[in-house]
Regions:
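Solvent-exposed, non-transmembrane regions of integral membrane proteins
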Residues: 1-260
Length: 260
């Protein structure tokens, strides 16, 4: 497995800056080398996309989600981002055949490609800083002890207490939704499935599970705490990507010519 935990902030940020600087330097100063020419070629684009799609399909078909933490998946995603960054840099040097639409074409290209690299990069470089832990919250028993998926314990700087658990049902008796009423730092909070409580800008608290055998009488529930400082980078990247797609839909495709 790739040692993701070794690259927590600020080391991941430093590595990201060094990577960007290295790619920019190679593009500006070594464009005639075989390596840079390959990275700028359609072959590199097709190869990187093919590798990424192939491993994603393999993970989906085999349910080997542990491979997302492997060296090979990390290397493929890094290679894909590197090719994409070279493409973005080259995009600044391109002009459309119809100069009237120059601004639209450039913004469209930047929004789509830079948006994709920001969204992917936030997930890739921010992975070491993302923390997902779970806790067993019991009725009237404050606790701050949590566990990572591999069983390692950790402790929150605040406590959570379960006060009540309710199951809302349809008229036929089937469950409609689940609700856990908890106390978080002396503040009453209602947790429902897919309706997390936002503790702060980077931390969300989810209702994950409960004692299904006890039903409404469940005296505990499983709570998941997700801390992701890079999530807003993903949101910004996705918004940029969608904006680029919208501009493409509005203005249609254009023909490019190389300026370099």
């Amino acid at each position: 497995m790739f040692p993701t935990e070794l690259f927590t902030f600020p080391l991941n940020m430093i590595c990201c800056v060094i990577w960007i600087a290295a790619v920019v330097s190679l593009y500006r100063n070594c464009r005639s080398t075989s390596f840079v020419r390959f990275m700028l070629s359609p072959a590199a684009t097709y190869f990187s996309i093919g590798l990424l799609i192939s491993i994603c399909i393999f993970i989906g078909l085999t349910d080997r989600r542990d491979l997302t933490d492997s060296w090979i998946f990390t290397a493929i995603l890094f290679f894909f981002q590197t090719v994409l960054l070279f493409v973005v840099l080259r995009g600044w040097k391109k002009s459309p055949a119809n100069i009237v639409h120059h601004k639209h074409i450039r913004w469209r290209f930047i929004m789509m490609h830079a948006g994709l690299i920001i969204a992917l990069g936030s997930g890739f470089w921010g992975a070491p800083d993302k923390q997902i832990v779970r806790m067993k919250a019991e009725t009237d028993k404050p606790t701050n002890e949590t566990w990572y998926i591999d069983g390692r314990p950790s402790w929150l700087p605040y406590s959570i207490t379960l006060k009540a658990f309710n199951i809302l049902k349809f008229s036929d008796g089937s469950p409609e939704s689940f609700e856990a009423k908890v106390i978080i730092d002396d503040k009453p909070v209602s947790l429902r499935v897919n309706h997390p409580y936002k503790k702060n800008l980077v931390e969300d608290i989810y209702l994950s599970s409960y004692d299904s055998a006890a039903g409404d009488d469940s005296n505990y529930c499983i709570i998941q705490i997700v801390r992701d400082p890079w999530k807003y980078g993903k949101v910004i990247g996705i918004i940029m990507l969608l904006a680029g797609v919208f501009l493409l839909f509005i203005n249609g495709p254009e023909v490019y010519r190389h300026d370099d």
